[in-house]
């Protein structure tokens, strides 16, 4: 008898006020205790109780001020990134109260040196017993660059070229200690075998790193590499490096195409597609009936101010949308940008979300509900489980990112109402079968790569 294939589940939320649902902080049931370690520890314990594979935290390195070139909207209305705690520090807080749950943090490969990144994640992996993932990003805009003393953000494809070399350097550092390099022979006075600890001497186009790292090899070999870039260059990067991919897609058809496209990139890079797990994001809103759940969804979306969505959209597209009146049709804005030969991702967003006929205010409200691409599903626990299974069996993903409607209650509801249904139907684990994140995801331990002495 063939064993039922099981899905993976991941939590995803900002260490701050807003993730995808921009009105979440205003929800009557939301806790705005996001500056407290106990807040994150509660969420981590909840997801571990639900046997989730992992949770991971996004990050941005600047307050959103692209809309209006000021802080009035991004900060005043509580936009995405108004508050953003440093993710690796939050992961350490959550690792202390969990034993199995995988924990991921986002750190930019553009604005931090590889030695620092390698050391941070090697340390977290040691302290957590091999449960850590690095979500690799290349950052987004000039506002982030200026916070690191750089006037202009590196061009998109060049950022990925640099990130390729960055990953090479980080992995060399993670491999600079052999498995048995640490001896700890008290009687003989031998702490470690220096012949098994190696300089990396990386000298490339972008980076120079001597090594070795000061942290021995991870309990899971290396931290898991997670990546979320879905541009053509980002997909090639994922094909080369990613062991888990975070995808945003508005419907089953796009999810399927994204899934197949990324798996093809992994195969083209000479890697095993089964060793890269693809997650797609969904936002469940639960209720004791379909009608109640739909009412709760409508309430959640009513909390979104149009301009707070436009603040995030301005940051994502690089266009100051405050330059246009709120009643301007999107098609007129697109025509104006095209006439002025202004390159922007706004055309792609508008086409993908069928927003060309909306006004700017309507698009802002829509974007603020789910950043345009995260499906919002309203239903009972049984109905949400049905949708997850339908998409899983339909080839949408290997697993799902559960984006919270509000925190921390959305995760409590999901674990109590959806997870048991998935478990009863054989689509999700009832117990953890291993200790490391690689165990949970079914990923092989990377072979130790040799280093020069």
UniProtKB/Swiss-Prot annotation:
It is an enzyme of class 1 (oxidoreductase). Homodimer. One of its GO terms (biological process) is dibenzothiophene catabolic process. SUPFAM superfamilies: Bacterial luciferase-like. It holds the Pfam family Bac_luciferase. It catalyses: dibenzothiophene 5,5-dioxide + FMNH2 + NADH + O2 = 2'-hydroxybiphenyl-2-sulfinate + FMN + NAD(+) + H2O + H(+). GO terms for cellular component: cytoplasm. Induction: Repressed by HBP or sulfate. Part of the dszA-dszB-dszC operon. This protein is expressed at high levels (at protein level). Pathway: Sulfur metabolism; dibenzothiophene degradation. This is Dibenzothiophene-sulfone monooxygenase. Catalyzes the second step of the '4S' desulfurization pathway that removes covalently bound sulfur from dibenzothiophene (DBT) without breaking carbon-carbon bonds. Metabolizes DBT-sulfone (DBTO2 or DBT 5,5-dioxide) to 2-(2'-hydroxyphenyl)benzene sulphinate (HBPS). It is found in: Cytoplasm. Belongs to the NtaA/SnaA/DszA monooxygenase family. One of its GO terms (molecular function) is oxidoreductase activity, acting on paired donors, with incorporation or reduction of molecular oxygen. InterPro entries: Diverse_substr_monoxygenases (IPR051260), Luciferase-like_dom (IPR011251), Luciferase-like_sf (IPR036661), NTA_MOA (IPR016215). The gene is dszA. Its EC number is 1.14.14.22. Signal peptide: none annotated. Reduced flavin is provided by flavin reductase DszD.
């Amino acid at each position: 008898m063939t064993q039922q294939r099981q899905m993976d589940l991941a939590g995803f939320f900002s260490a701050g006020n807003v993730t995808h649902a921009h009105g979440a902080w205003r929800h009557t049931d939301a806790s705005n205790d996001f500056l407290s370690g106990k807040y994150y520890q509660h969420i981590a314990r909840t997801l571990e109780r639900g046997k989730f594979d992992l949770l991971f935290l996004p990050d941005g390195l600047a307050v959103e001020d692209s809309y209006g070139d000021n802080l009035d909207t991004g900060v005043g209305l509580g936009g995405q990134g108004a508050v953003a705690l440093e993710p690796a520090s939050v992961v350490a807080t959550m690792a202390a109260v969990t034993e199995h749950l995988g924990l991921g943090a986002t750190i930019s490969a553009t604005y931090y040196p590889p030695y620092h990144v390698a050391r941070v994640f090697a340390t977290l992996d040691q302290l957590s017993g091999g449960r850590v993932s690095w979500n690799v990003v290349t950052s987004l805009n000039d506002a982030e660059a200026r916070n690191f003393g750089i006037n202009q953000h590196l061009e998109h494809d060049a950022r990925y070229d640099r990130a390729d070399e960055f990953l090479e350097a980080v992995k060399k550092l993670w491999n600079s200690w052999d498995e048995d390099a640490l001896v700890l022979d008290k009687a003989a006075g031998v702490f470690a075998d220096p012949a098994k600890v190696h300089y990396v001497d990386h000298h490339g186009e972008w980076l120079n790193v001597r090594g070795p790292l000061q942290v021995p090899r991870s309990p899971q070999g290396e931290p898991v590499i997670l990546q979320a870039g879905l541009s053509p260059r980002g997909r090639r990067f994922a094909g080369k490096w990613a062991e888990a991919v975070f995808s945003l897609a508005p419907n089953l058809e796009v999810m399927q195409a994204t899934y197949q496209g990324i798996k093809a990139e992994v195969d083209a890079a000479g890697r095993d597609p089964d060793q890269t797990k693809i997650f797609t994001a969904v936002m469940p809103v639960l209720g004791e009936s379909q009608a109640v759940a739909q009412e709760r969804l409508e309430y959640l979306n009513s909390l979104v101010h149009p301009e707070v969505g436009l603040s995030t959209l301005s940051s994502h597209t690089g266009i100051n949308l405050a330059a246009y009146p709120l009643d301007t049709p999107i098609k007129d804005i697109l025509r104006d940008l095209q006439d002025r030969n202004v390159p922007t991702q706004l055309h792609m967003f508008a086409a993908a979300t069928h927003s060309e006929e909306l006004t700017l205010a309507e698009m802002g409200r829509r974007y603020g509900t789910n950043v345009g691409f995260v499906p919002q599903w309203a239903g009972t626990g049984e109905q949400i489980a049905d949708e997850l299974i339908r998409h899983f069996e339909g080839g949408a993903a290997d697993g799902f990112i559960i984006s919270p409607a509000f925190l921390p209650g959305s995760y409590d509801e999901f674990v109590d109402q959806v997870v048991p249904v998935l478990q009863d139907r054989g689509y999700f684990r009832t117990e953890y079968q291993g200790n490391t994140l690689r165990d949970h995801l079914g990923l092989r331990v990377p072979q130790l790569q040799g280093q020069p002495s």
